[in-house]
């Protein structure tokens, strides 16, 4: 299995689906499933039963995971770019294909 090219804290653009074109920050990643959760994107409504923790119950809006193929890292100007790995100074770093700049993290 190859390394996940998108990590927590990355700014990404949604490439397809109902939220196409929206940008957000990755809040959580699931490398084994190749999925990420992006803030404010792919929001689903869950019906919650009343419980001791939540005595009121009701509707709850939750961000659902997206497959990594549906998102791309956003450049400084907000456009999507692919990512490749390079070895610089003995360290494996992520590099934006369009701009050639190193992605932090």
UniProtKB/Swiss-Prot annotation:
It holds the Pfam family ribosomal_L24. The keyword Transport does not apply. GO terms for biological process: translation. Part of the 50S ribosomal subunit. Belongs to the universal ribosomal protein uL24 family. One of two assembly initiator proteins, it binds directly to the 5'-end of the 23S rRNA, where it nucleates assembly of the 50S subunit. One of the proteins that surrounds the polypeptide exit tunnel on the outside of the subunit. This is Large ribosomal subunit protein uL24.
